[in-house]
Amino acid sequence: LNGLVFFAPVALLVRTLAGVSEHIFFLLQALLSGVIFLGEIPTGFITDKIGYRKSLIWAQVLLFGARSLLLAAFVSRSLALFVVEAVVEGIAVCFTSGTGSAYLYALYGENGYLAKTAHAGNFGTAGFIISTVAYAGIYKISGMEGLLITTVVANAAAFACSFFLRS
């Protein structure tokens, strides 16, 4: 469900329509990259303490929060919320980085890992394709706000599903 990012084809446009300049957009992307760079090791230590499943749930909580913040930032045209969204999304990425693969390896072992990783990757690709194709229809019906709302709803579903991950 994380592949369902309905605003992805127009990520720059989402922010510029809310008053963010292209220059600031790229600074926000740099902030996101910086948070990921700085957060990889600390979140890895946290994952070692709390386990893969809980880290993946935290990642979903944070990603849902980031998408909700993006919607709020767009509606309110708030640069501060765009900044917070970039930080929260960066932390979410840190919690997912490598954790999904490690979770699958721990769950299925060497024999089942490759097939399950390919299966998970295929779902991500399918989600990306579905959201890219659906983008035009959603945009025509409900505009940019509709794209963001649909993404938040998809992330809410992913968040709910994360609680059903096996231990």
What are these model-predicted stretches?
Residues 1-38:
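Helix-loop boundary and gating motifs at the non-cytosolic
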Residues 33-41, 128-133:
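Residue-level signature of mid-helix packing/kink "hotspots" within the transmembrane helices
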Residues 49-60:
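Cytoplasmic membrane-interface "Motif A"-like loop-to-helix N-cap segments
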Residues 61-77:
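C-terminal ends and interior cores of transmembrane alpha-helices
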Residues 80-88:
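Paired small-residue
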Residues 87-124:
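Cytoplasmic helix-loop-helix junction between adjacent transmembrane helices
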Residues 128-151:
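Transmembrane alpha-helix termini and helix-breaking/packing motifs in multi-pass membrane transporters
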Residues 146-164:
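Symmetry-related core transmembrane helices of the 12-TM Major Facilitator Superfamily/SLC fold
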